[in-house]
Amino acid sequence: MQRLKQQQQQQQVMMQQALMQQQSLYHPGLLAPPQIEPIPSGNLPPGFDPSTCRSVYVGNIHIQVTEPLLQEVFAGTGPVESCKLIRKEKSSYGFVHYFDRRSAGLAILSLNGRHLFGQPIKVNWAYASGQREDTSSHFNIFVGDLSPEVTDAMLFTCFSVYPTCSDARVMWDQKTGRSRGFGFVSFRNQQDAQTAIDEITGKWLGSRQIRCNWATKGATSGEDKQSSDSKSVVELTSGVSEDGKDTTNGEAPENNAQYTTVYVGNLAPEVSQVDLHRHFHSLGAGVIEEVRVQRDKGFGFVRYSTHVEAALAIQMGNTHSYLSGRQMKCSWGSKPTPAGTASNPLPPPAPAPIPGFSASDLLAYERQLAMSKMAGMNPMMHHPQGQHAFKQAAMGATGSNQAIYDGGYQNAQQLMYYQ
């Protein structure tokens, strides 16, 4: 009986320890009680009180939608006081004013993302642009790996434990009306922004662990002011302006197939062109056609053969983001690839040096390995003599053409020869 009690006590202690360990992953700001009435994700300023609002903003409206049709659709959630449609060339937007707040809230919850003429509309609270603080001179951080249920309000609650947090926005897809899985948070004080990056990265928000970094190039060196004329972070990434109007640009990098270049920032001074090529080649995102590094400025570019490959490289590059001890920042290059640019894939980079073996040793071994694969033989990697076979292959290939087997191409073995 005594032994059973001891086992139960041990189990309780273990459960308490596990609970404490789990809670340590959460930031105090993430443990805030849920709101009584959820606020949908969108362009909503922190501190905005929807209980005083009876109007909704409607964006991404198909050009065939008329004002009477828009009013008819939104009248389904409650009596409409007035409706205004503002027509644009590619997509329109409008405002619907209800007699009561509950009808407006129901419209947001039930109509956001619904399709009109095959195009999903965006519905959110309408507000005057003066209700949002000007954050153009604030310090902005990027927040990635957001779960689909995270809203602007949840994101702001998470970071509002820092006194100078001024704004928080989740980016959402123009076509689907869904979260794009990342957002931006603004701070009046640079130190608060840096502390947030250090403390909240890896913490849980919703169902995922989030990651944080500076949203602009050069932020860690004090050059973190936005240098995008008067455009906000939201305009530049999601096509939504400060006043809730649609500014979608079909030529934005994510929408333009001519963009095939990845910008890589925050590179360590010792990172060379070969190092960057080797890192992105190891990701296996696609065919690399050009690699450039500005070592004195700490950034570089990697050009792929297609837009899709470049997009995948950005995603993977920000996931596997450390090179020479620094966390890289990957995004779209500033210019599209000129039409008619010839496709010339780069040969695979030379393998990284291994202590005890020279580059020529590695090249010779790779050549022997490739030849054995082509002949249907077992790779020398399984040779019982191990490194002896490695050295033997290297010595036997002295003076001959050297080759690298590109293991990234599983369907077609390629030999890239060097004199």
UniProtKB/Swiss-Prot annotation:
One CC-aspect GO term: nucleus
PANTHER family listed in its UniProt record: POLYADENYLATE-BINDING PROTEIN RBP47B (PTHR47640:SF9), TRNA SELENOCYSTEINE 1-ASSOCIATED PROTEIN 1-RELATED-RELATED (PTHR47640)
Gene3D superfamilies: 3.30.70.330
Entry's localization field: Nucleus
Keyword Manganese: no
Entry protein name: Oligouridylate-binding protein 1B
Top-rank taxon, per record: Eukaryota
Principal subcellular localisation of the protein: nucleus
UniProt keyword Nucleus present: yes
Modified residues (Phosphoserine): S241
Domain (RRM): residue spans on this chain: 54-128, 139-217, 260-335
Region (Disordered) residue spans: 217-257
PROSITE patterns, per the entry: RRM
Free-text function comment from the UniProt entry: Heterogeneous nuclear ribonucleoprotein (hnRNP)-like protein that acts as a component of the pre-mRNA processing machinery. Functions to facilitate the nuclear maturation of plant pre-mRNAs.
InterPro entries according to UniProt: Nucleotide-bd_a/b_plait_sf, RBD_domain_sf, RBM42_RBP45_47-like, RRM_dom
Complex and partners: Interacts with UBA1A and UBA2A.
Pfam families found in the cross-reference section: RRM_1
One of the protein's GO biological processes: mRNA processing
Keywords, sorted A to Z: mRNA processing, Nucleus, Phosphoprotein, Repeat, RNA-binding
CDD domains, alphabetized: RRM1_PUB1 (cd12614), RRM2_PUB1 (cd12619), RRM3_PUB1 (cd12622)
Species: Arabidopsis thaliana (Mouse-ear cress)
Any one Gene Ontology molecular-function term assigned to this protein's record: mRNA binding
